[in-house]
Amino acid sequence: MLARIAALTERPRSFIRSFKYRRTDSIPNSSRREMDFTDLDSNATKCVNLRLCSVSGCMTEILEIRADRPSFHVVFVPGNPGVITFYKEFVESLFKSLGGTASVSAVGASGHTEKNWEHGKLYSLQEQIDHKIEFIKVQNIEAPLVLVGHSIGSYIALEMLRRLPEKAMYCIGLYPFLALNLQSKKQAVIVKVIMSRVLSTMVTLFVASLRLLPRQVLRLISELSNGKSWSNTAHEACCSHLPQYHTIRNVLYMARTEFIKLSETPDWEFMRENQEKISFLYGIDDHWGPLQMFEEVSRQASGIALSIEREGHTHGFCCTEAGSIWVARHIASLIKNKLAR
């Protein structure tokens, strides 16, 4: 069940955690602009922080790495579940792949936190979009923005591009969920659950009841359900956040509002108008971002840079170290090519 929920779709000092990552030596600005991925110093270290930030009164989990002299700022929006700790290895790999030229802020979804800071308040897709816009205002980010979104986060990133046209220089969607897939049996099942108050309540209560189990048992369930390919970080994120009653309620409620909104036709006109600023990465077997959508984007907005990942990673790339590293390097390559124009 934890695996299925994970597939749906990113105050106290004791909450703040630090991790180690590697970074490059200081290099000239010209080299920074070219983003040389090979000249990395294996001896230098710095901390990546998981911190709480109040955004419009909503306590938000932020996974962040700050560059000393950033030439741009990457703001990452997760999919649903919007548990940002799933993306630890990805954020580390992205910062490293960019050679320390950019700060990276990964912004968790409102209400998808480990603790129930918002006392059970539910957040819709539109409220998640507003939340990400407000984060940028609160942080007073001055450097040019590169917006990166995963799954429904890709849709959110596009809406951020719409509302921040002067500040956002690039928008990258990873395994993007931009419209309903009427051919997907999995999505048909999900629709029945999230649109039914009875079924969604039953799922919520069942998943939330799992937190009563010892942590070791929860971890075993996660490992048996998701397999050995998942990273330790992904298993921990699954066990710490998803069984929380307030989190799973928000996951299902957000999914409900996603399916309602994405039943509409995508705004192709907006994508055509901004096609030089947009890139999408699709997967081979991904019902959230199927290849027929890849083909439709290609027809509707031919100037959008489209790629297909053929390395065997999944929609949940962030749950494996190999997937996190590959996608991070792909993003760095896209940005490098964009800046070289």
Question: What is each of the regions a protein language model found here?
Answer:
Residues 3, 276, 302-341:
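Catalytic active-site module of serine/aspartate enzymes centered on a nucleophile-bearing elbow/loop
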Residues 34-59:
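N-terminal cap/lid segment of alpha/beta-hydrolase-fold proteins
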Residues 52-114:
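Short, surface-exposed "cap/lid" segments of acyl-processing enzymes
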Residues 106-146:
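Active-site loop/oxyanion-hole signature of alpha/beta-hydrolase fold enzymes
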Residues 148-153, 157:
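Gly/Ala-rich beta-loop-alpha elbow adjacent to hydrolase catalytic centers
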Residues 162, 166-202:
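Flexible "cap/lid" loop of the alpha/beta hydrolase fold
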Residues 211-253, 263-265:
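Conserved alpha/beta-hydrolase catalytic His-Asp/Glu region
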Residues 243-299, 308-309:
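Conserved serine/cysteine hydrolase catalytic core
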